[in-house]
């Protein structure tokens, strides 16, 4: 059993012991002719965040090319339940603390144990979901600008009903177009070290992810 499988099994134990439940959203399927609203457009290659490059240097096994094409996960009540529970559990488990306060540096991406910045939350959520059998091609680290034009990182789950966002600032799992964020870039489905722009024009704020600790 590898570490991700073990982590997923451990999370299932937590989930079952707490007897939590989440109702399946039957309206999550994208209506015919409206798919542009539910799926983010990609505009070619761009540079990854500095912190992610450093993360891959220390965790090369997490950043290996996967191959394959774009992946849209077929959703079910069970998968929705797991996505919601992972998001809620990690949001409650990890205290929001900036990298500057934790490590004395502006950005460091790590798997958190009890405290972390926005990117640390999503790394742990991604690890849990992969351990629960979710394909990594459907779990994409994503950089956005929030309502205050500050850098922030979230986890995108690409599904047959749209691109959904796991965010440390909310427990609700929303479609990307319902978040009020400006989406800048995210990982490629086939190679996590290659990033794709989600805006036509490059943004100077997209190199670092900061200000993502607030709820």
Which positions does each model-derived feature cover?
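Bacterial N-terminal signal peptides that target proteins for export
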Residues: 1-8
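Bacterial N-terminal signal peptides
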Residues: 9-17
């Amino acid at each position: 059993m590898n570490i991700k499988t073990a982590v997923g099994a451990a999370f299932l134990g937590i989930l079952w012991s707490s007897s939590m439940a989440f109702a399946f959203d039957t309206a999550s399927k994208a209506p015919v002719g409206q798919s542009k609203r539910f799926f983010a457009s990609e505009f070619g290659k761009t540079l990854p965040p500095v912190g992610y490059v450093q993360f891959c240097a220390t965790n090369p096994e997490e950043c290996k090319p996967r191959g394959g094409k774009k992946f849209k996960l077929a959703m079910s009540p069970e998968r929705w339940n797991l996505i919601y529970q992972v998001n809620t559990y990690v949001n409650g488990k990890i205290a929001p603390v900036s990298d500057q306060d934790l490590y004395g540096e502006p950005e460091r991406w790590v798997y958190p144990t009890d405290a972390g910045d926005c990117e640390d939350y999503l790394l742990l959520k991604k690890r849990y979901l992969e351990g629960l059998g979710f394909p990594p091609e459907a779990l994409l680290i994503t950089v956005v600008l929030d309502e205050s034009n500050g850098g922030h990182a979230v986890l995108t789950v690409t599904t047959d009903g749209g691109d959904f966002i796991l965010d440390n600032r909310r427990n609700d799992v929303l479609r990307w177009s319902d978040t009020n964020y400006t989406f800048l870039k995210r990982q490629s489905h086939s190679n996590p070290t290659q990033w794709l722009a989600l805006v036509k024009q490059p943004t100077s704020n997209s190199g670092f992810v900061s200000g993502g600790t607030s709820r």
